[in-house]
Amino acid sequence: MVQYAANIQDKVFMNMKSNNNLTGYVAINNDLGFFLDAEKFAPLLSINDEASVLLRLSLLIENFLEVFINNVRKPGTEQFVKPSRYFTPKLEICVALGLPLSIANSLVKLNSIRNKFAHKIDYSMTSEDYLEIERSVNSIDINEVNPLEAFNMESLQYMFSAGVDSLMFVKNAEFSMPEKMRRLHRLVGTIYILSNKCAFFTLNELKRQERLSMNKLKD
């Protein structure tokens, strides 16, 4: 099993700290592990089409909003607090439930670029589009998404300091890779990191509510 560190390649199993001060590999007992799973994003690295990659990334990350609502809302409120069909109402509910504004702003940025494709079928992402998304995700602070240290701070630090350059498939990209593919790889990596940060905060919030369930794995 690979340690969750600089390469950020493991999936649901992470080095975490529980209320009982247990350390080591644990399994998260809910559907948030999906957003920490690099294999969900890996197929996108072979797609050489901006619109297709952006749409799939948007759908992956929008699914987080539903998972956040379903996990974080107060038990018994399911009839009244539930995901809408549309992005903006779902995001508004998430913010009302405590989702940090830095994460919300990153989601809005991604959705706004997705909408450019919806309104102009031949739209091409500009360098500024890529940079705006990356800057927005980089602005999400480690203390904001891991306030209760549900995750070991040291194991996360490199990802937060290096950003997308902490990912092996970005660092090890072939020199001869076309610039378009290089930018798409960085986009996939950036949204993967955003997905991780979303999961980090949600798990911290569940810990705050004393509803975080995880089991220590056997050696």
Where are these regions (language model features)?
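Amphipathic alpha-helical interface elements
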Residues: 2-219
